[in-house]
Amino acid sequence: MTVWRGSIFIPVRVCHVVSLRTDPLRRRWLVWTVLAIVFLLVNLYRLSSAVLADRLMAGFNTTGAGLGTLHASFFYIYALMQLPTGILADRAGPRKTATAGAIVFNVGAIGFALAQTYHVAFLSRALIGLGGAVIFISTLRFCANWFRADEFATMNGLTIAIAGLGGIMATTPLALAANAFGWRPTMFGLGVVGLLFAGVVWLLARDSPESAGLEPIEDVETGTTLTLEEVLQNLRAVLAERETWVISLMLFCSTGVLITLLGLWGVPYVVQTQGVSVTTASYYTLLGSFGLLVGPPTFGWVADRFETRTGLIVGGGIVYVAGFGVLTLVPSPHQGIVALIYFTSGATLGAFTLSYAVIKDRHATAASGVSTATVNGAAFLGAAVFPTAMGYALDTYWTGETVAGSRVYTEFGYQVAFGIATAAIVVALCCGLWLHWKLPDG
């Protein structure tokens, strides 16, 4: 029997060209790419509220808190779905789970584009969260079955980098498309494209090399199909660990704050404190998304290369806290400083995302779905809580003015809102320090 030696890089064959469908080393990259495109769409949808904020507030006649709740409807259902997602990914497999999710969230996107009332928009965005909730964990479950353990942190980083790419698409490109075609036709078109890719996932993805009729890859522990009782047993083991809860709190704070910055309040903050247009302000969140594009794979590669995890989390956390501290303490920082903070915030979140590799390494491959889903649920619960919390803080300092139907807030109001975010990141850093103490590198 031929056993393929895996490599994190796409192999180059000198003697002959092997089909993408029959070479397991190439097949895994083909399928990962398709899953990554679907995950890109999830992130585009979930971060789209920032550049559409004025249009949504005017179109649905809502306040800052109302907009925060509309934005957060995605994340509440996304967070609640994480444990069921882990069970589905381990029990039904990533192929079926990802295909079903892609269909559901793109139907939600089409519904959001057609919504005429706040309540329909709320339900449609929640539907996007329902379907989108399964894509990330399904992709990580696929990686656990097709890549070696010493490649997982890198693959986790590359997958999260796709979130950054989706975030980039949700900034200036989305703003330009909304200006050119209108936000409703743009969202509708993206939903149609997403449905097409749902079909591609079903056609190409397989849960493991063996289920694709291919030879196994050397040193890859393929998770077997589990009974429901086995999955629940794994879940109980994951929930029994203190490390699980510490990582969950850390991701609740760190991820929740960044998604709130890039996905909602980051653009209005720049517009109202720097006096620029929405399109110009979207360049700042684009920088944050670019940081998210390069940070996680860089941290992941360093973690795999030098066998370090928790030390990187602490180092990244210190930089993260410093950046938000400036936004909290300085009423209107220089534009260059704001741009740098947005970029470094996205990049240093990559350090915190190493916790997915930490939790996965503590459990068998067969439990990778429930282990990563558990902590991922906390991350997106934070993304649901912080938009509304910061929105209430901003509404307290509303000037009483509106511009194009959107509320105008004071600089001090933004400082209070960012103070909430900074406090949360300090908590995340403390969690990282605890992990470094309990699980020292090496």
Language-model segments: which ranges?
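Helix-to-loop junctions at the C-terminal end of transmembrane segments
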Residues: 83-93, 296-308
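Extracytoplasmic gate region of multi-pass secondary transporters
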Residues: 49-50, 239-297, 387-391
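Helix-breaking motifs and short loop linkers at transmembrane-helix boundaries and internal kinks
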Residues: 45, 61, 93, 114-120, ...
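Helix-loop-helix hairpin linking two adjacent transmembrane segments in secondary transporters
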Residues: 158-212
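Juxtamembrane intracellular "pre-TM" segments in multi-pass secondary transporters
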Residues: 19-24, 206-248, 272
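Paired small-residue
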Residues: 108, 119-127, 336-344
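Conserved MFS/SLC helix-loop-helix module at the cytosolic interface between two early adjacent transmembrane helices
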Residues: 80-119
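Cytoplasmic helix-loop-helix junction between adjacent transmembrane helices
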Residues: 122-165
